[in-house]
């Protein structure tokens, strides 16, 4: 029974507060209810034992459920009160089969903190796979789903948890819930496959977005530390809950930041403990709940889904009497007094006051202004005439204008995206990014151009444009964070390396300021650089787009300052060749003859 009690404790105690009494399995068993209880256990097991089968885990989960009942009895077993991490690791290490099957021998030779670190590190090395591969057509999935809904969702949780061992359990369960909702909707439709294909694509995008946000936060924490994470979260939640005071928001954000390090390290026991403490304390504050409608609604969710609800909630209405604009100069004496004694408190108050007034702003715009304001306060607050000094220092910096200018920029990008086909816009992004970093591989630039297109396509759907700025800049910044972390920026070029090492809020602006790289020495532009044959006659739009992007990549790398007119000429010649050869009786022979001509003509154009 020790192993089974550990299975329960692994995840169930992981959502408990240290300040609560012992034997809290009973509390969570009651809060999460039976299905939530079993789901949490399944996530914890699958993430830590990726080479075990679902069949290996099912009987353990069933007995762990029985253990949960026993922990609610009048005489709970002693294992209900033992340390969860040590229990879990000891139980795993005592099973030779589990150790061998999951390659944990090295970890089990360690003890205490070293063993915990080894288990976390072992989990971190498991390959991630965010795709939601459909092994069966919609009709078969629907049949299985209708036959046994719980078993179907359980299989999804198992597979997704194994493929994503670093995702917090509450995120995995939110994703599983969403996938179940897709099937619930589509399995009642006459055209289930069409419905499934459409909704699955949307759902997959939402999954990628959520995971990108989590990963970006971890990257920011690793590179910039708690201070920047706290600033980001202060903006985010002040925008969502403008009715909360600065003091209330500050306390909440401190607790949020405390969860980041353990959650990003893969230490899900501590992660979920901290998250549970955070959500319980926030949801117990009746004063805040009475003023924050969105938070109040989320706190009515079950224990498993409350945290995800809070992260996804929309901004509440602003409080009555809140001025439209925040004027730092109106109370500069008090600002400087606070800044001199506790600069972080003063900067936090500034960020809060701007954020509650501007839910339409991105975090980055507010943080860019805050950085300028901080420099002004550093320069001026010790001076006798600090008020005039701050006015002079911030003369060219207006937060409202910054928000308007950035919003207008993205609206123009949206107009450009709407004016052309999806393929044309993605190709234009390929050209733009190849100009500034021709050293990058095709795969890298293909991903970047695809990401920019996907971000704008999603964010530009806000017809009024009220929230296009936070949507687009947040997602593009997440993409920059991932790119700078995935690749060695110095291997691309010094300009990209410089931007990746800029302050968090300035990275995107820095990249936009990069000019075409004229120092890059390109490879020879010849027919061997491109493979253009009968495969271009496919009707698969993705393959055609890929081929067109490869041609543009090769040409622009050869001359990063090539004109748009010359690119249009090459593109026209490419389509003419494609139409001619796809209509030819012997397509291969036609491409063999025409493709080298196109490359040769393109080479001549880039010399101009």
UniProtKB/Swiss-Prot annotation:
Glycosylation sites: 501
GO cellular component: blood microparticle; cytoplasm
Coiled-coil residue spans: none
A GO term, aspect molecular function: metal ion binding
UniProt keyword Cell division, yes or no: no
Positions of the propeptide segment: 15-18
Its biological purpose: Binds water, Ca(2+), Na(+), K(+), fatty acids, hormones, bilirubin and drugs. Its main function is the regulation of the colloidal osmotic pressure of blood.
Subcellular location: Secreted
PROSITE patterns given in the database record: ALBUMIN_1, ALBUMIN_2
Domain Albumin: 19-205, 206-398, 402-600
Descriptive protein name: Albumin 1
Annotated organism of origin: Salmo salar (Atlantic salmon)
